[in-house]
Amino acid sequence: MLRWTRAWRLPREGLGPHGPSFARVPVAPSSSSGGRGGAEPRPLPLSYRLLDGEAALPAVVFLHGLFGSKTNFNSIAKILAQQTGRRVLTVDARNHGDSPHSPDMSYEIMSQDLQDLLPQLGLVPCVVVGHSMGGKTAMLLALQRPELVERLIAVDISPVESTGVSHFATYVAAMRAINIADELPRSRARKLADEQLSSVIQDMAVRQHLLTNLVEVDGRFVWRVNLDALTQHLDKILAFPQRQESYLGPTLFLLGGNSQFVHPSHHPEIMRLFPRAQMQTVPNAGHWIHADRPQDFIAAIRGFLV
């Protein structure tokens, strides 16, 4: 059975003053609470990729969804930086991608991670674009620290519980059940993992998304996403913290036309928390709008930046 591990990619060298900069961080010690009370969870130094641009323009920050990573937005970030001249930041959430693992996992602590990172990089106030889990993190960040968020884009997610439409618990269980022998070629290991996942997850696009987390470390294939933490805190990830304050900045809820994640019944809560919210639907797109309709996704962001 595969287990998660802390798998790191070596940092690339900088590409000059106008190229991307990369950050790779060591594993940071978690709080003594382990997410179960006691000391407060501490922020982690997140892994990120920053594309250079005009400092006078608000930067665009992309936050990925559950099981994702900053690489989900690589192509879109490059295009957006070229077309708008803005700095574009993509970030790995804790327990995802190249960011450190921690037993602490909640929207409050993921928001705190960003409250530490964004000012350090000199990127505030910024435009925050969050998909799914990243969208909930972005919404909470805007509610808690509105001075950090110039405007907000929540991609196919709303500030309510998501359990009715998601299959994330099934995905976690399927990933934990994968069994791959050591020392196999990468292509063979990926094929075997896909075959085992397919017995539970019929959607090939979802399987391919999950398999981006399969990495080889010392001849063993492991999940780089922290499945233990996700399993323990999945209920928190599918929920959204109760808040009384509102974010008064410009807000766009970008919805997939074929997705059921944002329901009309969510609109009152959306408008309570985000009174300036606009709704825009991308036709023929599912939950992963940026993957299904990348050009429409970019066009929607650019239209909202004007």
Curated annotation (Swiss-Prot):
Residues covered by region (Disordered): 19-40
GO molecular function: carboxylic ester hydrolase activity; lipase activity
Subcellular location: Mitochondrion; Mitochondrion matrix
Tissue specificity remark: Ubiquitously expressed. Highly expressed in small intestine, prostate and thyroid, while aorta and colon tissues exhibit weak expression levels.
Catalytic residue list: 132 (charge relay system), 228 (charge relay system), 287 (charge relay system)
Main location: mitochondrion
Xref: InterPro entries: AB_hydrolase_1 (IPR000073), AB_hydrolase_fold (IPR029058)
Post-translational modification note: Phosphorylated.
Enzyme Commission designation: 3.1.1.116
Superkingdom of this protein's organism: Eukaryota
Enzyme class: hydrolase
The keyword Protein biosynthesis is annotated on this UniProt entry: no
Pfam families given in the database record: Abhydrolase_1 (PF00561)
Alphabetized UniProt keyword annotations: Hydrolase, Mitochondrion, Transit peptide, Williams-Beuren syndrome
Catalytic activity: 1-octadecanoyl-2-(5Z,8Z,11Z,14Z-eicosatetraenoyl)-sn-glycerol + H2O = 2-(5Z,8Z,11Z,14Z-eicosatetraenoyl)-glycerol + octadecanoate + H(+); a 1,2-diacyl-sn-glycerol + H2O = a 2-acylglycerol + a fatty acid + H(+); a 1,3-diacyl-sn-glycerol + H2O = a 1-acyl-sn-glycerol + a fatty acid + H(+); 1-octadecanoyl-2-(9Z-octadecenoyl)-sn-glycerol + H2O = 2-(9Z-octadecenoyl)-glycerol + octadecanoate + H(+)
Biased amino acid composition, Low complexity: 23-33
Subunit record text: Interacts with OGDH and DLST; this interaction maintains the functional lipoylation of the 2-oxoglutarate dehydrogenase complex.
Annotated family: Belongs to the AB hydrolase superfamily.
Protein name per Swiss-Prot or TrEMBL: sn-1-specific diacylglycerol lipase ABHD11
Organism: Homo sapiens (Human)
